[in-house]
Amino acid sequence: MSIPKISQVKDLTRIERIGAHSHIRGLGIDDSLEPREISQGMVGQVGARKAAGLILQMIKEGKIAGRAILIGGEPGTGKTAIAMGMAQSLGEKTPFTAIAASEIFSLEMSKTEALTQAFRRSIGVRIKEETEVICGEVVDIQIDRPATGSGAKVGKLTLKTTSMDALYDLGAKMIDSLTKEKVQNGDIIRIDKGTGKITKLGRSLSRVRDHEISGSKVNFIECPEGEIQQRRTETHTVSLHEIDVINSRAQGFFALFAGDIGEIKSEVREQINQKVAEWKEEGKAEIVPGVLFIDEVHMLDIECFSYLNRALEDDMSPILIIATNRGNTTIRGTDYKAPHGIPLDLLDRLLIINTQPYTEKDIYKILKIRCEEEDVDIQEDALQLLTKIGVETSLRYAIHLITSSSLVSVKRKGTDVSVDDIKKVYDLFVDVKRSTKYLKDYQDEYLYNSQPETTATKTNEEQQTMQTA
């Protein structure tokens, strides 16, 4: 007699992608715009967070539009983190677009077109629409199917509220929709008369004691009051860019999903602006100025900066937040130097927020938050060592060592990350300073190693040539 084998079932762990700023939930400020020491994933940068909170409050109140804010500071001081915190605090109702400055350089469209699309993605249009809906509890559904199976299906639907009940005749499409949504007696549904869309709101409270199997996600609600047929105002928020795409191509709405948008004619945008202005005057729509965040803004050239000067003066312009880690450097496309690599006429239009380098205490707290975010158990002395590494090298390098040291700990079947695990990955992966030192020590062994000629060297060579002549 053969013994049946029991197969072992492995647990499938859920894969979660953890980004560099996935631990940030907001700016971490209270109602009086005072930054908390540790809140919503944000640590330190008290002055910068307070300034960003003030800007955030003005954005929410709609008091400023067409303003630009520059976040400047050294690499690894949390510039992008502050922008992401602002995006999280604004919520989903306010459009937020984040791009890198190098994204606008493309062979398929011009630089100004890419910037225009980014600007219009950041401007929302909140459209109000009145619709007639039928809302009530399903009392009975009767569907008559033809015996031959070839004719059209007909049926009747009985709905009720606390005040009245009504009987509706059903066509074939409505019967299919009810079947698709698995509507049954006791469900509370809402039907949009214009589109025929059926929405299940939940189950009636009168059916709680019924002997039926219901899942944990079933929502029991009271029977609706008043009339079955009602008028309700629905609000839809779309960006100006989405309206541009729908009106710019023959395929219309499907161009949103195709991805191949290309350049949009200025005439189309002008017509859309006029239409939106009409809706605004009639009270059908309102403009929602959002936020456009451009990281590494020093990568833009002089033509892009000239476009930004003009775009910020437009009536429908979002809040522009730009970030850079450069000091006095050359403006791209010119031979002139300027602070942050930005022309002085644009700098004059900016509100500038400076970020300060993190202290050792701040780095310790940030690394602790990142360990919790990545579900890594780490010993206290190992965390102290990681903090010391972060102070001597960079915060990003220390954060990268968290995951790699966790993998080393798992391989040795440890429960948490120890000092030895940190030392092992520190030896395996070098930081920028050690890599630079290695290159200097062994530069003769590398191919094409040469020192760039300086102006002084060239001048000395020219003088020697003249003396020889």
From Swiss-Prot:
Keywords: ATP-binding, DNA damage, DNA recombination, DNA repair, Helicase, Hydrolase, Nucleotide-binding, Nucleus, Transcription, Transcription regulation. ATP binds at residues 73-80. One of its GO terms (cellular component) is Ino80 complex. The keyword NADP does not apply. Its EC number is 3.6.4.12. GO terms for biological process: box C/D snoRNP assembly; chromatin remodeling; DNA recombination; DNA repair; regulation of transcription by RNA polymerase II. It catalyses: ATP + H2O = ADP + phosphate + H(+). SMART domains: AAA. One of its GO terms (molecular function) is 3'-5' DNA helicase activity. The keyword Hydrolase applies. SUPFAM superfamilies: Nucleic acid-binding proteins, P-loop containing nucleoside triphosphate hydrolases. InterPro entries: AAA+_ATPase, NA-bd_OB-fold, P-loop_NTPase, RuvB-like, RuvB-like_C, RuvBL1/2_DNA/RNA_bd_dom, TIP49_P-loop. It is found in: Nucleus. Forms homohexameric rings. May form a dodecamer with rvb1 made of two stacked hexameric rings. Component of the chromatin remodeling Ino80 complex. Component of the RNA polymerase II holoenzyme complex. Belongs to the RuvB family. Has double-stranded DNA-stimulated ATPase and ATP-dependent DNA helicase (5' to 3') activity suggesting a role in nuclear processes such as recombination and transcription. Proposed core component of the chromatin remodeling Ino80 complex which is involved in transcriptional regulation, DNA replication and probably DNA repair. PANTHER family: RUVB-RELATED REPTIN AND PONTIN. This is RuvB-like helicase 2. It comes from Dictyostelium discoideum.
